[in-house]
Amino acid sequence: MIYKIDGDSINNAYELDGDSIGTAYDIDGTVAWTSRPPHAVSDNYTVSLLYDIPDIASGTQGIACDSLSQKIAQLYSGKIFMIDLSDGSYTQRASSFNLGHGSTGQFAPQKASQADLYPYLYVSTQSEKSINDTIYTIFVEVKVGESSSTINRAFYVPFDGPEVADGYTLFAFDFANSIVYSVYFSGYYTTTGTGKVKVYSLNDFTAFADGSYSPTPTNGCFVAGNPIETYDIDFIPEVQTLTFFDGLIACLCDYPHNNGKVIFLDTEYHDVYLVLDNLTVPFEREGIGFILNPSTNKYDMILSRRSTGVNEYYRYQFS
């Protein structure tokens, strides 16, 4: 089931395939969900334009990226961190791994207790590399503060689509459980499409010898083992970036570039959990993140967009 949130009424709940309207459930918890507990959001939200995020949470997980200007903005310890991939310390990584349309990144401490000491940046790409006549997508692990000539590790995941031109793969990371979600989307730049989610354990990647990328990873290259599970999804493309949040994969969509929406995929029930529609301002090739608001004890959603060469950040508060 998909529940459309347009700011005025929960009665606009609908199913994506249009077969039936279904039962509208209040998302504030007054009416129980049929499949899983409700999250702390409702059918109303307010928006404010932000240029600075106060330090209100430690080790906050989330991502906001701008692939047009090759900059990754990361929500970490309650603040936005900008890493310029086209100029400065990450130049070589950008050129080597072709960070472009759909690129994402997340700071990833290996252990919760090390969040402030050993932050890592995971960067997913839409690059492909042929290994034993198989098309692979890759994501790389970079330890923040390392020199531009090194990366930590490179991971290869089998491409999920029938052909490269038909779709692309993005990644979402559940760091607490050492899980990586490989999310494939078809129907590039169309209004309809299909998708596939493959779930991998970061512990099931095995080293292989022929992983020659420049710069060479300091700790080698690894290829994914068999997925823990695989399932198909229905979705509304054009997904630009995504992140894992509280058992959900939050996908920021911008097609047709004037009616941005966020689709939440349920990783437990393999269905669409929630759709936030009509996001006030259009979003194109931008990013999404979540941060705890101590005044409401709920998570606010942060979206970034690029406007006339300037990155803007919007906070969505749910009531």
Residue spans of the language-model regions?
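Conserved blade-ending motifs and adjacent loop-strand segments that build the rim/top face
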Residues: 271-293
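Blade-loop segments of beta-propeller domains
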Residues: 87-127
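Loop/turn-rich, solvent-exposed surfaces of beta-rich toroidal or solenoidal domains
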Residues: 223-268
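Surface loop/turn motifs at the tips and blade-to-blade linkers of beta-strand repeat domains
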Residues: 51-58, 94-98, 156-165, 230-235, ...
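Structural signature of eukaryotic scaffold interfaces centered on beta-propeller domains
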Residues: 56-68, 101-118, 163-178, 235-245, ...
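Beta-strand-rich domains and repeat architectures in extracellular enzymes and scaffolds
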Residues: 48-78
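A short helix->beta-strand "capping" segment at the edge of beta-propeller domains
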Residues: 37-57, 222-228
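Short loop/turn segments immediately following beta-strands, especially the blade-tip
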Residues: 85-87, 139-151, 197-219, 266-271, ...
